[in-house]
Amino acid sequence: MRPGFRFSDGIEVESQINQYKRTDVFVCQQDAHKPFDHRVSVYHVLKEKGCYPHGCVSFLWKCARLNKGSSCHRGFRHVGRKCFGCRFFSDEKIIHRPQIVVSSERFEAFRRDLRAFETWLEGLRGREVNYSGTVFSVKPHVTIDPSCNGRLSFHGFLVVFHDGFVNLVHLHDFCYLRVSGRTQERYRFKPGDRVDFFARLGESRGRIILTRANRIELEEEREGPWWNESRARVAVRTGAFLDRQPEKCLNCEKGCLVDVRDRGGTDVSVHRRLFCLEGIRNPGLCPYVKTGDGFVNECGTQRFLKGKNTVTRSNGILFQVS
């Protein structure tokens, strides 16, 4: 069981983390998980795929002509559903089983904590709760539909909290408040703001989501820039998707996870891709670095590397002098 949260006056209350989003329990060697170093969340394994302990089945499609470097006689460049029935087409059945990366004792403790968390969550799902916490970041809430030419849709903002209280329970994990552009314009939420409000609690693919916020009180307001709808729409149009999800980018105020809604026939599958609001496709070239007060753009500062050559960064341009 997780230890409770103790206030300075000695009063102790229950403490919870989001067990669904833990990535220290399972790993899966499927290629789709390679961008995440094969770490998979508890929610993905137990709820979305249900692949523990029996695993999941996938099929590797192959083309005898394309594998040899020859061209397809039907003009296709990739193997797909239209290749079914072709004499050069074959598929290989592959079974992937998630692996447990903790000891048996820790896994049993995890299962107990998971049951306690789910009991707590189900008791609050769909109900109005009181939440109090400090804003960690504010991100535009964006979705993309590949069937509509990859159109990005703006749905307001996500006010992100990392530590707070749900009623009298200490939630030491991420929690997301969905607000409209008008609400964000009114309260100007920004990192560091101390907020108390009532909202309806729910869960979306493992995330704890708060909606329909009311009786909002800004107990402490920080100075600094804040997102508004016009600025967010410009960032959405000029941003860029990343192929991976580096920890630095996930925690950066310029990075946000976009819900991708793939429509295959009558089914709609949802996954998330990392989107950089600054339009930086290569995290290695990103000038933003984490500091105690947030992220700072290092453009215009000098950097020196050990060795024969000196590298200087000025206004985002690298100069090398032997």
What are these regions (language model features)?
Residues 179-198:
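Short nucleic-acid-contacting surface segments enriched for D/E, G, S/T with interspersed K/R
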Residues 137-139, 163-167, 181, 201-203:
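Beta-strand elements of well-folded, non-transmembrane domains
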Residues 198-209, 215:
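Short, charged beta-turn/beta-strand-edge "cap" motif at the junction between a beta-strand
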Residues 175-182, 250:
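Short, solvent-exposed interaction modules
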Residues 143-177, 265-285:
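OB-fold (S1/OB) nucleic-acid-binding surfaces
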Residues 5-143, 212, 216-235, 244-245, ...:
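OB/S1-fold single-stranded nucleic-acid-binding modules
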Residues 133-136, 199, 252:
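Small-residue-enriched segments and motifs
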